[in-house]
Amino acid sequence: MKFVLLFGVLLVTLFSYSSAEMLDDFDQADEDELLSLIEKEEARAKECTPRFCDCSHDRHSCCRSELFKDVCTCFYPEGGDNEVCTCQQPKHLKYMEKAADKAKKFGGKIKKWFG
């Protein structure tokens, strides 16, 4: 049992270390291209609809979060006949972003420990 646990920990450590190295290689190779994409994204961000604001005028205008684009969700308030639409982030995408952030932080700690 101890061997299986030790092997599992070693496997997870090696996987996170190798994925951190691949991310570093990706960052160095495409730095110029990434900067141009960020500039375009900043220019486009001025036109998007922020989270929890009305998006009924353009249902595809919601802003992006760190990884995913927000979704225009429409509903009828209780006792009302008018449809209300707001930009919202689905819960499953919110949890995926949190998990990706924690994985990035953990990969950085592993890299710091092993040089």
Curated annotation (Swiss-Prot):
Propeptide stretch(es), residue numbers: 21-44
Record's subcellular location: Secreted
Bridged cysteine pairs (disulfide): 48-63, 55-72, 62-87, 74-85
Main location: secreted
Gene Ontology molecular function: toxin activity
Record key words, sorted: Disulfide bond, Knottin, Secreted, Signal, Toxin
Expression tissues: Expressed by the venom gland.
Top-level taxon of origin: Eukaryota
GO cellular component terms attached to this protein's record: extracellular region
Signal peptide interval: 1-20
Protein family: Belongs to the neurotoxin 19 (CSTX) family. 01 subfamily.
Notes on the domains: The presence of a 'disulfide through disulfide knot' structurally defines this protein as a knottin.
Official protein name in the record: U3-lycotoxin-Ls1c
